């Protein structure tokens, strides 16, 4: 049996690539990637001369069986995404599941992912959080947001610059305009920036300043009602 490695790649700065990731990509019998053109630039930068094969959301179900067979035959396969950690809003889950189901060793290297630095630098609680990634663009979007209306943990979303304002406005409708939010863009790149404030304030900012780059939006959870406050509300309700 071979080993399937899920290898994180930089989300911005090439210096975020780990030594172990470079070694695994050099030693692997096959490197799977979303886009051979994008990953080809990465491999060339680190002088990794290895074969690339496309493995993306449109072909992962069809190609996984053949990859599993190669792993069963003893090959070492490395999976990378265009940026970040495979499986986090990127292809990776299906192949990892199929490999594990067939008794193949699956190892994920620690490394770059966009939401962790955005969360930690947001100034919002990061001891407990829920990662939502990209919201559905149409079907189920409103239902999903409404299901998060009473979520008390910090929430994390990915968004493109073209939909940031619309998404923030939808957040304001569901969570209220005073909910705290941090919008982090261009993580680990030259123009990295975090805009923090209430939803109302951040919406106003991006209506005046055109959003650019990929965004991680970190939203505060709903404040828990203290037991003493809950008792007061109950007493008031029943005129105690």
Which residues does each predicted region cover?
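Glycine-rich, flexible N-terminal cofactor/catalytic loop recognition
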Residues: 1-57
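Class I SAM-dependent methyltransferase SAM-binding "motif I" and its flanking Rossmann-like core
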Residues: 94-151
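A charged, well-structured terminal subsegment
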Residues: 70, 140-156, 174, 225
């Amino acid at each position: 049996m071979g080993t399937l490695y899920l290898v994180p790649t930089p989300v911005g700065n090439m210096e975020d690539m780990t030594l172990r990731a470079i070694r695994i990509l050099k030693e692997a019998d096959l490197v799977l990637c979303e886009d051979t053109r994008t990953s080809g630039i990465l491999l060339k930068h680190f002088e990794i001369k290895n074969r690339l094969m496309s493995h993306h959301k449109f072909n992962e179900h069809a190609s996984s069986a053949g990859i599993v067979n190669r792993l069963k035959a003893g090959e070492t396969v490395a999976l990378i995404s265009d940026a970040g950690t495979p499986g986090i809003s990127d292809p990776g889950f299906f192949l990892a599941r199929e490999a594990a189901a067939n008794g193949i060793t699956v190892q994920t290297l620690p490394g770059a992912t966009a939401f962790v630095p955005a969360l930690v630098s947001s100034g919002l609680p990061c001891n407990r959080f829920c990662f939502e990634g990209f919201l559905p663009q149409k079907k189920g979007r409103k239902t999903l947001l409404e299901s998060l209306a009473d979520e008390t943990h910090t929430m994390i979303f990915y968004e493109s610059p073209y939909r940031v304002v619309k998404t923030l406005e939808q957040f304001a409708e569901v969570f209220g305009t005073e909910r705290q939010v941090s919008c982090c863009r261009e993580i680990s790149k030259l123009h990295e920036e975090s805009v923090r404030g209430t939803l109302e304030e951040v919406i106003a900012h991006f209506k005046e300043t055109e959003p650019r780059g990929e965004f991680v939006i970190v939203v505060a959870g709903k404040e828990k009602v203290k037991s003493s406050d809950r008792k007061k509300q109950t007493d008031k309700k029943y005129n105690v």
